[in-house]
Design a protein with these regions (language model features):
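Gly/Thr-rich phosphate-binding beta-strand-loop-beta motif of the actin/hexokinase/Hsp70
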Residues: 1, 135-170, 341, 441-462
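Phosphate-binding loop and its immediate beta->loop->alpha context
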Residues: 1-113, 122, 186-233
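Catalytic P-loop NTP-binding/switch module of NTPases
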Residues: 35-38, 43-45, 450-485
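Conserved phosphate-binding catalytic cores of ATP/NTP-utilizing and phosphoryl-transfer enzymes
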Residues: 118-146, 334-354
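Glycine-rich phosphate-binding loop plus the immediately following alpha-helix
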Residues: 3-14, 160-206, 247-270, 390-404
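A short acidic Gly-Thr/Ser loop motif
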Residues: 145-154, 180-182, 293-297, 356-360, ...
Length: 485
């Protein structure tokens, strides 16, 4: 078993002397190009956006996140073909804050690329297995996994217990934010670098020079040096394409300023508090240890924040040394997800662990311009099913005969305003065949999980059957949500 790590970057390069042909450059090779308009970065972040599309000049059209994902998986499939000849079984890791349909979108893209997806893991859960100490000792533990990556913050609460020689690993809860290293980089650009060089950027824009992505690369380099080399301030320089060298500076104080302006501490404390409030039998004082992963964990702001929330007796930032973690466990914080996934699969196939997913979530729809919660997956009782929900016909028509579906991990009332604070995750849409419906009659919706764990959506209207009015299915839609670890 082996793992291969690459940046999720897709560069659409036009092949010279081959009219109309485009070569997809994926991963590390794509990082080296400076043809920014034809390059797509951080596709997982774009999968979280409701209607993301990006125009690619070399293609002459927009591309959607699912299409880019499939290109990346085709690249992986080709890499596997060169290394192994037997069936290509893979594990995919995904952010905690992905909805079930976003997970399905990635899963479908992998299958379309010819890959056999055997495991789907949350990134924070996979990261925990990168440490040998995660499955060690005789005592029961309740571990908080904090994984700050490039696009998302993923948090999982995991209970570990022993059953003879085997381990029982229970995922008790998860939460997260659509906030990661890329948001920090963009914040540094907007709040620190742009004000320092406003005139320069104005002149570059007037000359038609696309400087933004190059400056982001400089910011990433300076940020990594600040924390990996334990510097208080660092600098870098570049011509940015106009022939004049410009010097850039970044300090730790600058980074903290950005994080505070973004309200990061308050947002993280809020999702942690809401997670514990959703668990009737667990409080934060039950947590025995905290484990940090992800490139963002190098920024000492986050270890300090976790010490403040849990207390130094559970996690002391002064004892946290990311370089020691790299050395002892043989992998970096940045690659912990991939390495952990391999270790998890090995243990799973050897029969040494039993994994139980107890994470609850709730599904709902946009109804009367609000979120209406209509289906729960409860961590104790399993799945609940809905009765018939009457839709707002006028709203359905205004939305183009689609029903917008949302997911939340938060314990919230049945009906709440639609917000963009991250608590509601857009899942996708249920499209209705307009010609099948009598628009003078109400449309009804019922959601439930079938025996395979797939979500079924039944759309119905009242019809006369044997001289009686009955609610009869007009359409049935299925969404594959089963099998997620």
């Amino acid at each position: 078993m082996w793992w291969y790590l690459f940046p999720n970057i897709n560069y659409n390069r036009e092949i010279k002397n081959s009219k109309g042909n485009i070569e997809h450059i994926i991963g590390k090779s794509a990082l080296k190009n400076e043809d920014y308009p034809n390059t797509i970065k951080y596709i997982k972040k774009k999968l979280q956006q409701q209607n993301w599309k990006g125009f690619i000049p070399n293609l002459g059209r927009d591309v959607e996140a699912a299409e880019v994902s499939e290109d990346i998986f085709k690249f992986i499939s080709k890499q596997l073909d060169e290394r192994i000849k037997n069936e290509k079984e893979i594990a995919i890791t995904m952010p905690v804050c992905f909805s079930e349909l976003q997970k399905q979108c990635l899963y479908d893209a992998a299958v379309a690329a010819g890959l056999n997806v055997k495991y789907v893991l949350s990134e924070s859960f996979a990261a925990a297995f990168s440490q040998e100490s995660f499955l060690a000792g005789e005592e029961n533990r309740l571990s908080l996994i904090f994984d700050l990556g490039g696009a998302t913050l993923d948090i999982s609460l995991v209970k570990i217990s022993r059953e003879g020689e085997d381990f029982i690993v229970e995922e008790m809860a998860s939460t997260g934010l659509a906030y990661g290293g890329t948001d920090i980089d963009e914040g540094i650009l907007a709040e620190i670098i742009m004000p320092q060089h406003a005139e320069l950027f104005k002149n570059l824009t007037a000359k038609g020079i696309d400087y933004r992505k190059k400056v982001i690369e400089i910011i990433i380099s300076m940020k990594e040096r600040l924390y990996e080399d334990e510097e208080d301030e660092c600098d870098d320089s570049d011509t940015l394409g106009d022939g004049n060298m410009t010097e850039f500076r970044l300090s730790r104080e600058d980074v903290v300023q950005v994080l505070e302006k973004h309200g990061v501490k308050e947002r993280i404390f809020t999702v942690l508090e809401e997670m514990f409030e959703s668990l009737p039998d667990i409080i934060k004082e039950d947590v025995t240890d905290v484990r940090l992963f992800g490139g963002g964990s190098y920024i000492d702001y986050f270890p300090k924040l976790l010490t403040e929330f849990f207390g130094a007796e559970v996690f002391d930032y002064e004892d946290f040394d990311p370089t020691a973690l790299d050395r002892n466990d043989g992998n970096q914080l940045k690659t912990a997800v991939a390495a952990g996934a391999v270790r998890y699969i090995t243990a799973k196939e050897n029969g040494n662990i039993k994994v139980i997913n107890r994470i609850p979530f709730h599904l709902g729809i946009k109804n009367n311009n609000r979120f209406k919660r209509i289906l729960d997956r409860n961590r104790v009782w399993g799945n609940s099913n809905t009765g018939w929900v009457k839709l707002n016909n006028q709203e359905v028509q205004q939305d183009g005969f689609v029903i917008n579906l949302y997911q939340t991990f938060a314990n919230m009332p049945k009906i709440v305003p639609l917000t963009d604070d991250g608590s509601l995750i857009y899942m996708g849409k249920i499209s209705l065949e307009k010609g099948l419906y009598d628009l003078q009659k109400p449309i009804f919706l019922k959601l439930f999980f079938d025996n395979q764990g797939e979500l079924e959506a039944h759309l119905a209207q009242a019809k006369l059957v044997d001289e009686e009015n009955q609610i009869v299915d007009v359409e049935v839609k299925k969404f594959g949500l089963g099998g997620w670890s």
